[in-house]
């Protein structure tokens, strides 16, 4: 696993303390990432309290989310599409110039793409040009099906040179299938959780997705000798979270 997103150090004391403890732990391969949002409307990135906490956090990588759907830009942010692009650009540039590696999550991307393809692509390009190493396309409400995910991600990877990631939810029971479709269409970064633990109906189950992609489709994601640890890890997480793995694949 390349990145472990450990929480939002700005949101609560427990997450902040977790990052303090993680600073003392050396991992063999994985990199710890913090999570937060782009700057608020009406203030600079330098003055945004959430971004300042991400800048000061021990994690070298910051994952930040921003808007990609004009409906939310107008109704939730209360700003213009142009200002939203500036918010994304300035937030990423601020973190990058302060030594952070940045992954940008394009929230509700697929809804935004269906509503306005050109603007959604502008969001992707803006984030990448500002310094984001990956731009993650988020099916935030879990309403997409694999065929449309494949079609849209294929178009994005053909039209841009941006390293694309995928983030899916299981509200339609399609999180793993949509994630696999995105990889087959050219996505190079997968977000998910062990056993699919997550809000509402859950996220893509990494244990299932990794096994399916590597064992069934031939992608090399983890060392062969690490494959048996997927089951061990899934059972350990199930015990900690008190969520049964009965009936889950592998």
Predicted features and spans:
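Catalytic cores and adjacent flexible loops of soluble metabolic enzymes
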Residues: 1-250
């Amino acid at each position: 696993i390349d990145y472990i997103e450990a929480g939002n150090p700005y949101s609560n004391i427990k997450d902040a303390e977790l990052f303090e403890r993680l600073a003392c732990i050396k991992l063999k391969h994985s990199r710890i990432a913090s999570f937060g949002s782009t700057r608020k409307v009406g203030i600079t990135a330098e003055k945004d309290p959430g971004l300042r906490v991400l800048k000061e956090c021990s994690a070298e990588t910051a994952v930040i989310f921003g808007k990609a759907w004009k409906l939310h830009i107008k109704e939730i942010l209360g700003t213009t599409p142009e200002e939203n692009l500036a918010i994304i650009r300035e937030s990423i540039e601020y973190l990058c110039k302060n030594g952070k590696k940045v992954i940008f999550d394009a929230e509700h991307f697929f809804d935004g793409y269906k509503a306005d393809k050109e603007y959604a692509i502008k969001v992707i390009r803006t984030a990448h040009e500002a310094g984001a190493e990956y731009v993650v396309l988020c099916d935030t409400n879990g309403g997409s099906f694999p065929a449309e995910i494949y079609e849209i991600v294929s178009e994005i990877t053909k039209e841009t040179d941006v390293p694309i990631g995928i983030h899916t939810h299981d509200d339609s029971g399609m999180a793993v299938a949509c994630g696999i479709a995105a990889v087959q269409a050219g996505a190079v970064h997968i977000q998910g959780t062990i056993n699919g633990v997550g809000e509402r109906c859950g996220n893509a189950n990494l244990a299932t997705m990794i096994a399916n992609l590597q064992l069934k489709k031939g992608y090399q994601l983890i060392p062969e000798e690490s494959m048996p640890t997927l089951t061990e890890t899934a059972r350990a997480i199930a015990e900690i979270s008190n969520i049964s793995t009965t009936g889950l694949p592998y």
